[in-house]
């Protein structure tokens, strides 16, 4: 089973690919996709999708794990995040991947045991739970790894 974890964002999206063979988890890859706020939104969305499409084609995931969003007090920010999620979900659908959504607190609780854990705690724990993640220093990538981990553990794949 190969999971593509996605921490959705318009400005700086985190992604990670984690595989499970029998009971062992293997970190395969991760990265961030940065877009510039000065670019047109449709170009930013197209750029995100072009990178994620390359990841899907290279690693052939079976399922995508994506973070559920919460409504921000800033309506514009929430709307832009919704655009990014919609574009990502469209890509997931185009490649006929299964998709699971997880609330941020569920991911935090699964990875750290505490539903209100901070970014540093998540980063610390993924390095202990999944070999090969030692070099991850970016919280967006760490969140994506945590999403993939949660999917594999919570859904018992």
Curated annotation (Swiss-Prot):
Disulfide bonds: none annotated. The keyword Zinc does not apply. Gene3D superfamilies: Ribonuclease H-like superfamily/Ribonuclease H. The keyword Metal-binding applies. One of its GO terms (molecular function) is magnesium ion binding. Binds 2 Mg(2+) ion per subunit. It is found in: Cytoplasm. It catalyses: Endonucleolytic cleavage at a junction such as a reciprocal single-stranded crossover between two homologous DNA duplexes (Holliday junction). Pfam families: RuvC (PF02075). It comes from the Bacteria. Mg(2+) 1 binds at residues 7, 140. Its cofactor is Mg(2+). Keywords: Cytoplasm, DNA damage, DNA recombination, DNA repair, DNA-binding, Endonuclease, Hydrolase, Magnesium, Metal-binding, Nuclease. Mg(2+) 2 binds at residue 67. One of its GO terms (biological process) is DNA repair. Its EC number is 3.1.21.10. The active site is at residues 7, 67, 140. GO terms for cellular component: cytoplasm; Holliday junction resolvase complex. Belongs to the RuvC family. Homodimer which binds Holliday junction (HJ) DNA. The HJ becomes 2-fold symmetrical on binding to RuvC with unstacked arms; it has a different conformation from HJ DNA in complex with RuvA. In the full resolvosome a probable DNA-RuvA(4)-RuvB(12)-RuvC(2) complex forms which resolves the HJ. The RuvA-RuvB-RuvC complex processes Holliday junction (HJ) DNA during genetic recombination and DNA repair. Endonuclease that resolves HJ intermediates. Cleaves cruciform DNA by making single-stranded nicks across the HJ at symmetrical positions within the homologous arms, yielding a 5'-phosphate and a 3'-hydroxyl group; requires a central core of homology in the junction. The consensus cleavage sequence is 5'-(A/T)TT(C/G)-3'. Cleavage occurs on the 3'-side of the TT dinucleotide at the point of strand exchange. PANTHER family: CROSSOVER JUNCTION ENDODEOXYRIBONUCLEASE RUVC. This is Crossover junction endodeoxyribonuclease RuvC.
């Amino acid at each position: 089973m190969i999971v593509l974890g996605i921490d959705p964002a318009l400005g700086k999206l985190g992604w990670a690919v984690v595989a499970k063979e029998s009971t062992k988890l293997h970190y395969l890859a991760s990265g961030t996709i940065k877009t510039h706020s000065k670019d047109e939104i449709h170009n930013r969305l197209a750029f995100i999708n072009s990178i994620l499409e390359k990841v899907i084609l290279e690693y052939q995931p079976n399922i995508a794990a994506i973070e559920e969003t919460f409504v921000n007090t800033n309506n514009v920010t929430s709307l832009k995040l919704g655009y990014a999620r919609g574009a990502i979900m469209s890509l997931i659908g185009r490649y006929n991947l299964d998709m699971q959504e997880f609330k941020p607190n569920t991911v935090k609780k699964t990875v750290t045991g505490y539903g209100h854990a901070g970014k540093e705690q998540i980063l610390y724990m993924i390095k202990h739970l999944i070999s090969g993640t030692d070099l991850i220093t970016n919280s967006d990538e760490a969140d994506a790894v945590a999403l993939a981990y949660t999917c594999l553990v919570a859904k018992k794949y």
